[in-house]
A protein has these predicted regions:
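Glycine-rich N-terminal segment of FAD-binding domains in flavoprotein oxidoreductases
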Residues: 1-6
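Short active-site oxyanion
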Residues: 9-15, 56
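Catalytic nucleophile loop
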Residues: 15-21
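Conserved phosphate- and dinucleotide-binding cores of soluble alpha/beta proteins
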Residues: 21-181
């Protein structure tokens, strides 16, 4: 609908894509793009893999959680659009926490993560290609299942040397839309 409004109503916007896939989609739809180098966002909208009753999120199945977190942190207002199936009683119920790591830190990070007593840690592997998924930042992704995610988990993960970012979004100021059918 945004692309249609740009064409029909001469709506003037610039999108700041968080991935090459979104950048390509914007190009196909005729939505002009920019970057955080050039513009500060007025607002952000995105989706989520899971959302709890406190509007904490798990994001990152697409592997762009570093750029997503950077954009959300840079925005005065963030809207998260989800359908009711994304609502969970506790984060981690349906999806693991994705963690973007520097490749050479893999063994070290896995060792440090084991101290958090996760249910499972898996290196995200490519489908239709050999080897692990490599993010646009040149890093790998560990998917970490946890039965319980304490409030300090995001900062604990971020404090591990070799972790660039996680897909855990705790206590961000977001407005979640679409939870009711």
């Amino acid at each position: 609908r945004i692309a249609e409004r740009i064409r029909t109503e001469r709506l003037s916007i610039l999108a700041i894509p968080t991935s090459l896939e979104i950048r390509m989609t914007c190009a196909q739809l005729g939505i002009p793009v920019t970057s955080l180098f050039s513009h500060k966002p007025d607002w952000t909208f995105d989706g989520a893999d899971e959302v709890d009753s406190h509007f904490n999120l798990i994001k990152g199945r697409g592997g762009a959680m570093f750029k997503e977190k950077l954009l959300i942190s840079s925005s005065p207002q963030t809207y998260i659009l989800v359908d009711p199936s994304k609502k969970v009683e506790r984060l981690g119920a349906k999806f693991p926490i994705p963690i973007e790591i520097f490749p050479e830190a893999l063994t070290y990070v896995e060792d440090r993560l084991q101290r958090l007593n996760p249910g499972e840690i898996k290196l995200r592997m490519g489908q239709g290609k050999d080897g692990p998924i490599i993010t646009e930042n040149g890093n790998m992704i560990l998917d970490v299942w946890m039965d319980y995610i304490p409030e300090n988990t995001e900062s604990t993960l971020k404090s591990i040397t070799g972790v660039l970012e996680s897909g855990l979004f705790m206590n961000y100021k977001v407005e979640v839309l679409g939870l009711t059918s």
